[in-house]
Amino acid sequence: MWHNMAMTRLWFRCGLAVFLLVLAGSAFAAPRLERERCTFKPPRGDRIECFTLIVPENREQPEGREVRLKVAVLKAKRTVGAEPLIYLSGGPGDAPLMASSPGADALAEGDWWNETAAIRRRRDVVILSQRGAGGATPNLDCFDPRTTDPAKARRRAVTEQQERDILVRCRAGLDKRKIDLAMYTTPALADDVSDLASAMSLAKINIYGVSYGTRWGLEVMRRYPDLVRAAVLDGVYPPQVNGEQNEPEIVRQAFEQLYAECTADPLCRERHPGLRSAVEGKIDAAERAPVELTLQLEDGPHPVRLDGSKFLMVLLHMMREGEAALIPETVAAVQRGDVRLLKMFAEDLESNDGGLLEQNAQQFDGLYNSIECRETWATVDRAARRKMIETSGVYGFNARTSKSPAFCPVWRVPAAPATERQPVKAAVPTLLLSGTFDWLTPPAWGREAARY
């Protein structure tokens, strides 16, 4: 009898131990939110809550490394229980919760409170960091080892071989930390959104994706169609599209639209009758004799030489910023020796995106490399792309400057399976937005996504 009772107690203890282990394991694997102190300063009358979302790096190994993602909830004016709007940022690698300089307020910099005021009348707006980007741990960003200040790294002149060496060291450092770059993908980011909804006890969400964030949002809709109540996709970038393959033709089409609209407008046609030849001629002339400017930036004046590629970059930036109508006058002014308009837009481009000075930290963005090398460059026909660049005249100058063909072999990530490149078919009410002159996500891509 005592033997049976002892055995019963033993089995009970063993069973309890196993149960507790299973419970602990499942609790560890489950996504969870931890409240944290907000560093953002909302305007009077507005409220914000800040959290860290904790999820597994590899969901097939939930006991392994954790990923920590910043979350900001801009609270609705009224608590009515409406499904929140989750903002999906672009890039990949954009970090809307990270300020451009220490001590600054990222939400104030992005004018988030004003931009979301109408939505927040009855819905919370939730901003989620991208895994691997700013605001997340681990962060895959790499900077020039001569400085840890991104702004200074951005101003340093480095050769392409030095850039490559930086990435080699960065990749080796990530390997040493046992960070699995194969887990920093669009599907993994989509799973993070689902885990966020689960941790917030949300049965339904609305999503607003911008640029790359539209591809992120489409993947959420593919993987979790019952989770998404409605979606707005702004600057549509569907998974079946490879933007790098035909970039020169996309750039050409944006300018063809500009030429056509100028011809159709009596005033533009009268003032700029030879717009095509003026634009192409000035870009080509800058390639042979760069336009010299001094940009007035936050950290002081910086001389820059705009060759054909950089001159084209400024014009493309004007298109994306809704200033395409000023391109004819900007080019005409430069022909007269007046570079004031060109300088103004060059300063705006360098301040916001970089790319005109010798170097900028964007190309050391590890998450960008991980996703673009895996999902885009792995399927690019490089010989066909080179031929298109060579035969596209000035419209191929921008594509010619891409470093990804040289950097992706260094980054060493596996190619995405073909299933991820299939169109997304989801019965979710969706508003697709595309800018007429948005050459990075042209209107044709929105029409392509709408077919499904």
What do these predicted ranges mean?
Residues 426, 432-434:
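Short beta-strand/loop motif that positions the catalytic acidic residue
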Residues 191, 209-221:
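Glycine-rich nucleophile elbow surrounding the catalytic serine of serine-hydrolase chemistry
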Residues 207-209, 234, 433:
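Short beta-strand immediately N-terminal to the catalytic nucleophile in serine-hydrolase-like folds
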Residues 439-445:
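Conserved alpha/beta-hydrolase "acid-adjacent" motif
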Residues 175, 190-205:
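Conserved acidic catalytic loop of the alpha/beta-hydrolase fold
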Residues 26-157, 276-287, 412-416:
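Catalytic-loop region of hydrolases
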Residues 280-425:
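Alpha/beta-hydrolase fold active-site neighborhood
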Residues 114, 141-151, 217-282, 313, ...:
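A catalytic-pocket lid/entrance helix-loop region that shapes and gates access to the active site
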